[in-house]
């Protein structure tokens, strides 16, 4: 009596696949974000997502995320943050596979139909405030730095400050710009260990420059500012403001804005750690010109406040 031989069962490999195609074949249901996260874990290069822009109205928002993994950078845009992240991850996967000519469409399959649209998005403003309370910091301060564009297409730039940390956000409404700025600060806090930073360092040692102290100051630089015109061409206002800051003992920081102005010029903000905080906007044909313009505007403001009774 002959024995029938059954085919041998395939050997199971205990090794985990390391190539993208192998990982996708093993887990075909994984989303691009999950697949890229798995790839990053295996290679030691974890993907980092940063919210670049939030535009549109409440009923039709548009988000843009920048993704960095190793030496690769990609952008993704979509009607929700998750969709934008998925598209950025998909494009990064295509680059890793060596195919930059296509970006596979990613449908918004992550939306929960049981939740209304206003509950779909995260609330970075609220999250940042909660973080500040947990750490014992002062609550976030938001300042409108600029409003530009025609009435039907306004563009707002808002600065968000938590202690000495500052970020800017731009959007088609103040609320959107505020959310972007808060999101950027939250992302920054995720990359640093705030638990190891002493509170006195966060608060800073140069927060005592008030308007009254400026008015009563007899320092050389501030006295010169009070009596000098600020309309002389080719003046180095950056140096002039730096000299005033050193004399009055406040911090001076320039924040470059990624987006160009409606006229195609560079933009920046000059932030002075006076009490209260002073933020002035500047534009120019170069980054240096924008800094000089912001310094000029800041000096004009200081001069007005020093003379004002």
Swiss-Prot record:
PROSITE patterns found in the cross-reference section: DS_RBD (PS50137)
Biological process GO terms, please? regulation of regulatory ncRNA processing; siRNA processing
Q: Which Pfam families match?
A: dsrm
Question: GO: which molecular function terms?
Answer: double-stranded RNA binding; siRNA binding
| UniProt KW keywords | Cytoplasm, Nucleus, Repeat, RNA-binding, RNA-mediated gene silencing
Q: SMART domains, from UniProt?
A: DSRM
Q: Where is the DRBM domain?
A: 31-98, 123-191, 236-304
One GO cellular component, as annotated? cytoplasm
Instruction: Give the InterPro entries listed for this entry.
Output: dsRBD_dom, PRKRA_DSRM_1, PRKRA_DSRM_2, PRKRA_DSRM_3, RLC_Component
List where in the cell it is found. Answer: Cytoplasm, Perinuclear region; Nucleus
- The region called Disordered is annotated at 1-22
PANTHER family in alphabetical order: INTERFERON-INDUCIBLE DOUBLE-STRANDED RNA-DEPENDENT PROTEIN KINASE ACTIVATOR A, LOQUACIOUS, ISOFORM B
Question: What family is this?
Answer: Belongs to the PRKRA family.
Assembly and binders: Homodimer. Interacts with dicer1 and eif2ak2/pkr. Also able to interact with dsRNA.
What's this protein's function? Activates eif2ak2/pkr in the absence of double-stranded RNA (dsRNA), leading to phosphorylation of eif2s1/efi2-alpha and inhibition of translation and induction of apoptosis. Required for siRNA production by dicer1 and for subsequent siRNA-mediated post-transcriptional gene silencing. Does not seem to be required for processing of pre-miRNA to miRNA by dicer1.
Protein name (database record): Interferon-inducible double-stranded RNA-dependent protein kinase activator A homolog A
Q: What is the lineage of its organism?
A: Eukaryota, Metazoa, Chordata, Craniata, Vertebrata
Q: Which gene encodes it?
A: prkra-a
